[in-house]
Amino acid sequence: MSAYSRPVLLLLCGLLLFTISIAVLNTLVPLWLSHQQLPTWQVGMVSSSYFTGNLVGTLIAGRFIQQLGFNRSYHCSCILFALATCGLMLTVDFWSWLGWRFLAGIACALIWVIVESALLRSGTLTNRGQLLAAYMMVYYLGTVIGQLLLGIVSTQLLSVIPWVGALVITAMLPLLFAQFSHQSRHESPPIAVWPMLKRRSARLGINGCIISGVLLGSLYGLLPLYLSHKGMSDASVGGRMALLVSSGIIGQWPMGRMADRYGRLLVLRIQVFVVILGSVAILGNYAMAPALFILGCAGFTLYPVAMAWACEKASADELVAMNQALLMSYTLGSLAGPTMTSLLMQRYSDNLLFIMIAGVAFVYLMMLLRKPDHQQTPYAAV
């Protein structure tokens, strides 16, 4: 039987529409704040409030799904995101936007956990990899479409918010025609997340997820601001962001194949080294588009390879707790990255964005170059 059943396809359709909305706002929110002459550190704090919401949403998602089920929790999360989006029209104020983006971050994290969990519950041991691969491709595709739309439609606040809100409401419709059961055949006691974070064999993978969060959080939150300060229009910024994310889509398959064939450790070393090269190329004012392309190829594929490394020695019963620990690690990184980087950019120079990215990547590369604990196999079953 095909892994892509009717409910799965409907769920992925809803995710695509929702992700387009996320991508549009993640790019335009920093630009709107910049146009209002807010200082860089405040723009970074608004980005960080979104990632703080991601962290809170990750922590409450399990109980939320348990209480409401997949379908109702999905619809409630969409409504929360739509309300947080419409709230941006009330006033362009630092404190109010801090709150609205926090709520939007909670809604996004809930949607991610709901969709991932529903896909895992729908799949089997033989097709879960296909389902999660489709999930990542849909997510990145929605991100690219959202960036490309910025070159077609008006980017004014009062023009964007109504159709983005309508798109989120439309994303609720597919799950009206699909039902996902959240009851398991036999309940087992939940496994704590904290022991997963302390597991020695998973340390490099967990650190990789943190670094990935710092990298992607900074790029999503501050690269639009960096490009805007370079004199680019909103449409040009959207095009550069689309290039960045598209390179991540292109890099997914070859990086996964390399990791399967040559081992996670070697691929992680290559990815981190390429991130450093891309950052240095941008700082050296070399061709921006090729530099962003190689940065996206390496940076956007770092998280799944690090996640596979961390899950390598986790038993089947521990996978949910380990995945939760990894998502928390990523979220903490994506929270810390824009906060620290925006303060440095405000104090010194916009170039600190790529200096910070190259710096944290170099630290992780030093960890990877140390001899790791012996592994029975360099490959991980995904």
Curated annotation (Swiss-Prot):
Predominant cellular place of this UniProt entry's protein: membrane
Keyword Cell inner membrane: yes
Residues that span the membrane, as ranges: 8-28, 41-61, 73-93, 94-114, 133-153, 157-177, 208-228, 274-294, 325-345, 349-369
Topology of this chain in the membrane: Multi-pass membrane protein
CDD domains listed in its UniProt record: MFS_YcaD_like
A Pfam cross-reference name: MFS_1
Localization of this protein: Cell inner membrane
One term under GO cellular component: plasma membrane
Domain of life: Bacteria
Keywords: Cell inner membrane, Cell membrane, Membrane, Transmembrane, Transmembrane helix, Transport
Gene Ontology terms for molecular function: transmembrane transporter activity
HAMAP family per UniProt: MFS_YcaD (MF_01149)
Family the UniProt entry places it in: Belongs to the major facilitator superfamily. YcaD (TC 2.A.1.26) family.
Xref: PANTHER family: TRANSPORTER MFS SUPERFAMILY
Listed name of the protein: Uncharacterized MFS-type transporter YPK_2680
UniProt organism field: Yersinia pseudotuberculosis serotype O:3 (strain YPIII)
